[in-house]
Amino acid sequence: MQARDPHVNVIFVGLMGAGKTTVGRAVARRLDRPFFDSDHEIEARTGARIPVIFELEGEAGFRDREAQMIAELTQRENIVLATGGGAILRPENRKLLHERGLVVYLRANPHDLWLRTRKDKNRPLLQTDDPKAKLEALYEARDPLYRECAHFVIETGRPSVNGLVNMVLMQLEMAGIVAKPLQA
């Protein structure tokens, strides 16, 4: 795929379980760009899993690390970045994301997110008595913030990963980021 503006980063935002890492990795592969996941980068740098960081430093400590990682990663050019679900909580992160890349909000309804994440013990915010209710509350609080920093929204629904990747590539083509989408 030919890039019209090879310097524009493609950044994925959305709630946990929306598919940011899976879709982002596939988009990066199709665009022949490096892929980064901010949560994975934090884990690699600290040598600790996200739940351990939450336990030791609290959510505020983790969000500090996340803001630093986002600032660092978005200084690069020509990358595809998947952010953590709460990356948009801080106004400075929303501003950086919006200014330093083309932001794709992968929107999924809370029920689908619950089905995808219900058995995952590596999601500290869902370690509650009612994780489905927690996802609904997170969606209500965060949806406006995702929309604020997004350049466009992709409704994930139930299409395949390849279907979502093609939708993203079509949006990138319409935004002038790539010349034309390639089929997988």
UniProtKB/Swiss-Prot annotation:
Any one GO molecular function term: shikimate kinase activity
Catalysis: reaction(s): shikimate + ATP = 3-phosphoshikimate + ADP + H(+)
UniProt keywords, alphabetically: Amino-acid biosynthesis, Aromatic amino acid biosynthesis, ATP-binding, Cytoplasm, Kinase, Magnesium, Metal-binding, Nucleotide-binding, Transferase
Cofactor names: Mg(2+)
Positions of ATP binding: G17, A18, G19, K20, T21, T22, R123
Residues binding Mg(2+): T21
Entry binding sites for substrate: D39, R63, G85, R142
Pathway info: Metabolic intermediate biosynthesis; chorismate biosynthesis; chorismate from D-erythrose 4-phosphate and phosphoenolpyruvate: step 5/7
SUPFAM superfamilies for the chain: P-loop containing nucleoside triphosphate hydrolases (SSF52540)
Cell compartments where the protein resides: Cytoplasm
Main location (coarse class): cytoplasm
Assigned EC number: 2.7.1.71
Record bears the keyword Transferase: yes
UniProt-listed GO biological process terms: amino acid biosynthetic process; aromatic amino acid family biosynthetic process; chorismate biosynthetic process
Catalytic class of the enzyme: transferase
Ranges in coiled-coil conformation: none
UniProt cross-references to PROSITE patterns, sorted A to Z: SHIKIMATE_KINASE (PS01128)
Function, in words: Catalyzes the specific phosphorylation of the 3-hydroxyl group of shikimic acid using ATP as a cosubstrate.
Cited PANTHER family: SHIKIMATE KINASE, SHIKIMATE KINASE 1, CHLOROPLASTIC
Family per record: Belongs to the shikimate kinase family.
Subunit composition and interactions: Monomer.
HAMAP family on file: Shikimate_kinase
Protein name, per record: Shikimate kinase
Species, as recorded: Burkholderia mallei (strain ATCC 23344)
Annotated gene: aroK
